[in-house]
Amino acid sequence: MNMRRGIPAEWRRAWSELVLRARQTVADGLVVGTSGNLSVRVGDAILVTPSGVPYDQLRPRDLLAVDRRGRPRAGTLAPTSELPLHLAIYDSTDAAAVVHTHALHATAVSTLVDELPPIHYMTAALGGPVRVAPYATYGSEELAAHTREALRDRTACLLRNHGTIAHGTTLRQAYEHTAQLEWMCHLWLTATSSRTHTPALLSRADLEAVSAKLAAYGQS
């Protein structure tokens, strides 16, 4: 498809933001090389990062879009191998954006526990204690199914021996959920490194109280 004609302006704007956020994952140390992937839903189309292309090389002409079943809508590059993962999330949630990374501390935690203990009140911002989806080969329908279950009533989860996945109503929110999860994993690893103390954890009631406050958070 001609990138100067026939591409909606809304898609072009969304692609620009997608590329900026993709580059931010590298700058913030959440991915290495071409690992990780991002997508954003625009109407009935999903814009997604391509497979194996360094984010600093992505240009407007590289815009890549598929439909909700993964069929090509625009672009000539192959989509990320994790497309099934993204499609599963859009199919099972109201997500408008998805961010997948190989963040160091989060990936380390994914090898240690089945659920990230509620060590910080911002656990509530992700819907509750963050689950770890069982390991499955990247890009597989099995991994997509495990992730769908781990994300039930959550906006982020860990992928065993793999990384993180988070979604949001905007790309910015999905990225913030990703960064928050990586920070909490770093916090948990730091706290559990003590040989003399055990980290204090929050109760369900604690998290419910925070959820209520977060619902009214921000400027009116």
What is the meaning of each model-derived region?
Residues 1-220:
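Glycine-rich flexible loops
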